[in-house]
C-alpha cells in the first residue's frame, strides 16, 4: 500500500479504537484521533465501536504518512463517511490535531463530545471528584512530554482545575508515597 494511494481494503482485524489491519497485511493508524490504550478506561468500548463500524468491511484508506511503528497513518472512510470523525463524535476517541482533511469537523465533534460528557469524557473516564474520599491526590500522566505529575488537594485552584483522565493514564492516589512509587513527581506549582 503506497503512502499517497487512495484505495479500498477489507478490514481483517481491529487492534484497538484507532488502529487496524487490512487484507494486504498493512496496519493502519487512524489520522487525527487518539483512542485509549488497551486496559485504560474506555479502551474496550472504543475497540468495540471501531469493530462494529469497519470490521470485515471495505473501507477507503487515504494514507498521509507512516509512523514510528511502521503503520500507515490515514483518513479512513466507510460509505463516504469519515470513520475518523465518527470515532471522535462518539466520544470514544479524542481529537488530536492533525492535517486530516476532516480536521475542522473532528475538532467540532471533539468539542461536542467533551461538552456533553460522552464516552471517554463521561464521569466514568474523566473525573474531578475522587471516587474515594481517602484518595484525593490527582496524578496526571502527560503522554506528550512524558511528565507524570501529582497534585495534592492543598494546591488550591490549581488542584480544582485538574481533571483525572483515566483514559489517558491519569490516576487517583491515596498518599504521596503511593504516587511517587507509581513514578509520579509532585508538581512544583503546589506547596
Pin down the residues of each PLM region.
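Mature, structured domains enriched in cysteine- and short glycine motifs
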Residues: 89, 94-98, 111-191
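Stable alpha-helical elements in mature extracytoplasmic
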Residues: 46-50, 79, 83, 88, ...
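Electropositive
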Residues: 2-100
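Polybasic, low-complexity, intrinsically disordered segments
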Residues: 1-2, 111
Amino acid at each position: 500500500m503506497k503512502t499517497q494511494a487512495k484505495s479500498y481494503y477489507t478490514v481483517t482485524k481491529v487492534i484497538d479504537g484507532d488502529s487496524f489491519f487490512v487484507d494486504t497485511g498493512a496496519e493502519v493508524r487512524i489520522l487525527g484521533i487518539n483512542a485509549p490504550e488497551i486496559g485504560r478506561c474506555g479502551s474496550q468500548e472504543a475497540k468495540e465501536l471501531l469493530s462494529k463500524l469497519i470490521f470485515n468491511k471495505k473501507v477507503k484508506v487515504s494514507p498521509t504518512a507512516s509512523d514510528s511503528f511502521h503503520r500507515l497513518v490515514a483518513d479512513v472512510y466507510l460509505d463516504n463517511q469519515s470513520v475518523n470523525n465518527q470515532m471522535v463524535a462518539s466520544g470514544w476517541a479524542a481529537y488530536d490535531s492533525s492535517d486530516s482533511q476532516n480536521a475542522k469537523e473532528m475538532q467540532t465533534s471533539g468539542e461536542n463530545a467533551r461538552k456533553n460528557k460522552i464516552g471517554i469524557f463521561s464521569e466514568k473516564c474523566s473525573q474531578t471528584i475522587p471516587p474515594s474520599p481517602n484518595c484525593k491526590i490527582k496524578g496526571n500522566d502527560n503522554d506528550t512530554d512524558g511528565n507524570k505529575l501529582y497534585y495534592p488537594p492543598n494546591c488550591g485552584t490549581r488542584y480544582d482545575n485538574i481533571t483525572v483522565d483515566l483514559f489517558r493514564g491519569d490516576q487517583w492516589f491515596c498518599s504521596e508515597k503511593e504516587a511517587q512509587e507509581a513514578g509520579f513527581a509532585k508538581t512544583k506549582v503546589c506547596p
